[in-house]
Amino acid sequence: MKTFGSGDYRYQVVEGWGQIPQLGLVSGVACDSEDRVYVFNRSPQPAVLVFDADGTFLTSWGEGIFKHPHGIWISPDDEIFTTDRDDHTVRKFSLSGDLLMTIGTAGQAGEPGQPFNEPTRAVLSKSGQIYVSDGYGQSRVHRLTAEGGLILSWGSAGSGPGEFNLPHDVTVDRDDRVYILDRGNLRCQIFNSEGEYLTEWQDLRSPNDLFIGSDDIIHIAEGGQRVTIMTLEGEIVERWGEKGTAPGQFSDSPHGLWVDSTGDVYISEVVAERRFQKFARV
């Protein structure tokens, strides 16, 4: 079986994983504390499909809720946050799919500079505040209270520090540094919690999704059929990915990515082939 990557970061695709029923375009993936896998897809069927780590289908939920599923993220306390791009909303769910909170006005874009206009991802910081990348309709990042109240927004359209061309993903590390994948500008910008620019990483291909593990290792899903693995200091430790339709290859661009507690990597692609793959670390 072919191995992708090298050194400490070698992977083999798990062929046939999931036997996914009625899969739509897969925009995102996340795992809970038990390594159950939540596949977020655009389909007339339920938007969230749940599997165990071996690929056994467990349940589904979310039918009739979402207009355009985009980002999904699960906190260490097993709270699920989703972004619905075309509905301009962030939603919080329990693991069983109970809706706990909606932030934003369904079907209505926020005023310029205000939440939300086609948001892309929502996550929690260590202190429990919500960060949202926003998104396709405007070039902003929002920091909210745990209840959804606006604390701070920053960003504008452009290519300079603190400017964005499609902020496609937000992630916050344990020291409250905020990582924004600035997809249209082919970079990751890093800020403090007050929105002050710290630094940026370039040399990225249309970055889509960023995951920080408990070991402080970063995985980035990129356009151009690539996954980049980095340290928090920006040192690249591995890159892998091939174009194609064979198992382990990417026919388009990895769009969603998550790493479970064992180091296995799940990657989704938003393409007509409805591709979703698991890569086991070896």
Model-derived features with residue positions:
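Eukaryotic scaffold repeat domains enriched in small/polar residues
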Residues: 1-282
